[in-house]
Amino acid sequence: MESQNNIDITANELYEKLESWNKDIKKSIDESKKHKKYSLKPKDLLIKFNRMPTPIKDLELIDIKLGSKIYEDEIFLEKDFIAENLRRGESLFYNKSEDSYDYARLGLPKFFDYQKSFLEIGTENKLKERVLGKIIEVSKNEKNVKYFVYLTTKVNGENFQVSYNSKYDCWVIASKNVSIAIRNKEDIEFYKNEKNFEEYYQGDSRIETMSEKEKKIKEKKDKKMEKKKKKLERIERRKKGKNEENDNQNENEEDEKDDNNENNENKINEEEKNDKMDIKKSKGLKEMLKRFTFSLEFAEIWLKILQEKIINNSNSDLINEFKKELGDHTLIGESVGDKKREHILVYKERDVIFYGIVNNKKLLSENCLPLSNGFDLFKKYNLSYTEISPSQKFDSLEDLCIYINEQFDVIFDKSLQESGEGNVIYLSCEIDGKEYVKGLGKLKTFEYRFLRKVREKCKTVPPPVDRSKIEFEIKKKFNELKKKKEKKKKDKDNEKAEDEEKEMIEKINKKIENETKEKNQERDKRINNIINKMKSESKTLLNEVPKSKFNNDKDLLKEYYDFGEYLINYRAKDLTNYFDVFASFIEVMKEKFKAKVEINDLLINEIRKKFEGLISDNDFKEEGDEDAKE
């Protein structure tokens, strides 16, 4: 692999640049309240730095990511600064003794869906700029350029990144957002010991609920007020001269005793507070260490891969050669075969499937290394890698886009079993015999896009109508009315009062029935609207590919729509049990789509544990990114 030592921006410069961005954003938070696009607020644009210790003396590892997860796609699409300076995985080393930063690892840029409309004249937007912008720039400024594209199969696993740093002789192993630095297997234990992280604990864990806390504060306040009241009473009695000298002495002793008790109580409270703080800190540290869950698993996998695929298959000299060649670069792949975290596609063995290599020192000027270079390295060191299909070379960018549009149609019609989510495209060009990757994008299958669409719609299904809540509210109103009438008509005879009571009960029941019926009708209407929206949005997808088999086979398309409708209605029946929806989702998918999807018991148990018994609308929020899962 070619070594490129010139840096386009130093780690120190990058850190200062990102900090400066945060300062400007914080100013805009104070100054502006009008930022309403995508419900986005200035605080969503803040960059988050997670600074953690490492087993190496005086060395910290800083994971850098966008603070907002909800609006990540919109921010990366709209904000040039974020798109240029943040990757899907980015970490720096900080050497405390040298007061300097170094690159630790670098992921691929954030990339988006390719659209056929990019080829249309006059189509200019941020999405096109993100996917094709750099290669369009090449076509305008360079001559004698050859254009081509690599299609790689999208691996269905967990994002895995590994880099080797020669300065500190360590591996940086990471999920998308959380990294660790280790030199050997023993260093893994460092990340399991709470004591190593005590000074980094920010106190973000809570032990008491607010109600418990408020209750204790009130009790303490009442006790103090009672003491103060007694003391004031004694002082008042003295002023009026009603106490004899003996009583005064007793009261003075009582005052002194109260003061001593208060001091002792304060001391005990302080000790209790410290004990609680220790418990809270311990709990908080345990929570904090959970963020390393994926990275520690990945470290075990990586050390095993090194042992089995490189050291055992050759000799110890090869590992040194591998480190030398990998230095200042990050391998990008997906961890697969974990039965506890299977996705739609099932992999027989635990492994890491690689698909890209990024130069850590080329944040601004390179997306990643040419795929031909990367795949040569994977082959040389016996690492698993994804399938790759290079296109022919074209003389113009327009010809390249025509070819990609043809591939768009082919991939669109493929099944989940054939292509899973779809393909990632690496837009490449050759200038003076040298290859560059100038853009990345995604081509997705209709099946995958449809399933995502159904999932999105399931999230918007309103909860079932709560009849008991309606009953409670209506009865409450009638009882209030009843009390008012009783005050005015105390002199009425009992028989008339009983008749009025019966009449009121009838009114209550009728109102409950009517309101429940109205709300159920309103909910049914909303569910039908969701189903219709699912169909209309799917038609919009199909309009992109007029010759698609789904457009030409109406019965096939009806099966898909029936399936989507079935899932949305299933979700509507029982909002609390997402597991059943998910299981049905897979079973119907197997039957309708003829997809050979394996479901193992471990997977089912994991899903059941995760989703069973949930009762709120949060069930259908995006999974993800607590740091441990990223």
Regions found by a protein language model. Give the residues of each.
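Core nucleotide-handling region used for phosphoryl-transfer chemistry
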Residues: E2-K218, R234-G241, N269-E630
